[in-house]
Amino acid sequence: MTTPNIELLTAATPNGQKISIFLEELGIPYKTTAIDLSKDEQKYASFLKVNPNGRIPAIVDHSRDSYPVFESGAIFLYLAEHYDKDFKFSFQDSDERMDMIQWLFFQNAGVGPMQGQANHFVRYAPEKIDYGTKRYKNETKRLYSVLEARLQDRDYLAGKGRGKYSIADITTFTWVRWAPWAGIEMTKFPKLKKWCEEIEERDAVRRGLLVPSGEDQIEKLRRNPDVQDPFKAWVRKGQKEIADTHGN
């Protein structure tokens, strides 16, 4: 196998952290390009060549003709296909692989978008809208209840028996860990909480959580519930730009 040379373009968000964690778990060489969201670097022409949607994370595989990949789910599958040849974090069996992909999509299409909207209405909406806040917090909790049920007699989300730690867990872990950011209490989800805490103890996970800044916003929140929100200004700025460009 060609020596990997992965460039990760990222920021310290749940979607960014999930890919840095997987790269750390794989133990392959990679370099990080920090994308400053407050400066709209994700909208720079150089970044849009990698991801035309202007969102992090993205990777460029310089060991394979500088092949670009965007969307975290696609990045997971790409890295697993090319750099998890021993199936440590994925599955060789076709049924187990499909099991993993289903939970990967469950996070990407459900947990992430719904919890992201909960984040928005809890933290970033310029006016408080009870309907939006309750709708997305409740939907996030419903999705958490699906995960809670899945973990009743299992250690991990995908695989036969009690399951195996895989990219299905990594992709979901970072969002569940950010539950407090959306005002979600974990007391009703004891299995999910335990699963999250155990994954956080992994050495590779701890390293990945500090990419790219060396700081971890959730750890800051645990120490100080009133910690300054580093995302509010650019979220509101981005919403205004979208409204100005695409609004009626």
Put a short name on every predicted segment.
Residues 1-134, 238-248:
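GST-like domain detector, emphasizing the conserved glutathione-binding G-site
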Residues 92, 207-216:
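Short, flexible loop/turn segments with low-complexity composition
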Residues 37-38, 194, 214-215:
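Positions that flank functional sites
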Residues 13-20, 167-170, 202:
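Short, thiol/selenol-centered motifs that function as redox-active sites or metal-ligating centers
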Residues 103-201:
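GST-like fold's C-terminal all-alpha helical module
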Residues 212-248:
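Acidic/histidine-enriched, glycine/proline-rich intrinsically disordered or flexible terminal extensions
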Residues 49, 201, 210-211:
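Phosphate-coordinating loops and pocket residues in cytosolic domains that bind phosphorylated ligands
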